[in-house]
């Protein structure tokens, strides 16, 4: 019996185009100004320090080449860090520090009314129905928890953060690693077999299934993956029968 549902965001509850064509470009436009600000807040400084630590431990050859060219390898300048972030963005590299910084920038954009998150029309009705059934709802996304909560706090359907009781990001572990889903099940306090994971990424579904979770592969118009493999396919959350 399913007692909890863990939802991906991009391509599952929110169109992939919002993330790729709105959120990421917005963060990139604000990145230099945010990093180079003389009066940057402490959370930005913390994200930058985390990025430097990640950079020094990044084994990728281009990352190390950039570090060697930095004016001070022990304490890269703001300009050096921007070059590193540009490299991560251009190559779609996953970075917890970059995600944190993007989340800070998006928070400013949401607060200013420059950003609003579109949801698929079936999402809120499904969340409401599951909540009424006593199902625990959680989020697992590669975006930071801050970014997740901002997205759901500023949707076209209003603030729906109260529908979710737990939030997970890459600090829990990689989404393609089965151990990450085992950690999530432990955090929720349920056996994996009692948890349903929904995502538009077949390999994420593979990892969740390996951990023992039930899975649904979500195929939406415009999603990058169309083959869900052995996972049961849905086209909207209303198709999920518990």
Curated annotation (Swiss-Prot):
This protein's pathway: Amino-acid biosynthesis; L-methionine biosynthesis via salvage pathway; L-methionine from S-methyl-5-thio-alpha-D-ribose 1-phosphate: step 3/6; Amino-acid biosynthesis; L-methionine biosynthesis via salvage pathway; L-methionine from S-methyl-5-thio-alpha-D-ribose 1-phosphate: step 4/6
GO biological process assignments: L-methionine salvage from methylthioadenosine
UniProt keyword Hydrolase present: yes
This protein's record includes keyword Magnesium: yes
Annotated CDD domains: HAD_EP
Details of cofactor binding: Binds 1 Mg(2+) ion per subunit.
Cofactor needs: Mg(2+)
The protein's enzyme class: hydrolase
Pfam families: Hydrolase (PF00702)
Coiled-coil boundaries: none
EC number in record: 3.1.3.77
InterPro entries named in the record: Enolase-ppase_E1, HAD-like_sf, HAD_sf
Keywords, in A-Z order: Amino-acid biosynthesis, Hydrolase, Magnesium, Metal-binding, Methionine biosynthesis
Catalytic activity: 5-methylsulfanyl-2,3-dioxopentyl phosphate + H2O = 1,2-dihydroxy-5-(methylsulfanyl)pent-1-en-3-one + phosphate
Domain of life: Bacteria
GO MF entries: 2,3-diketo-5-methylthiopentyl-1-phosphate enolase activity; 2-hydroxy-3-keto-5-methylthiopentenyl-1-phosphate phosphatase activity; acireductone synthase activity; magnesium ion binding
Subunit and partners: Monomer.
HAMAP family: Salvage_MtnC
PANTHER family named in the record: ENOLASE-PHOSPHATASE E1
Family under the similarity heading: Belongs to the HAD-like hydrolase superfamily. MasA/MtnC family.
Stated role: Bifunctional enzyme that catalyzes the enolization of 2,3-diketo-5-methylthiopentyl-1-phosphate (DK-MTP-1-P) into the intermediate 2-hydroxy-3-keto-5-methylthiopentenyl-1-phosphate (HK-MTPenyl-1-P), which is then dephosphorylated to form the acireductone 1,2-dihydroxy-3-keto-5-methylthiopentene (DHK-MTPene).
Name assigned to this protein: Enolase-phosphatase E1
Organism: Synechococcus sp. (strain WH7803)
Classification lineage: Bacteria, Bacillati, Cyanobacteriota, Cyanophyceae, Synechococcales
The gene coding this protein: mtnC
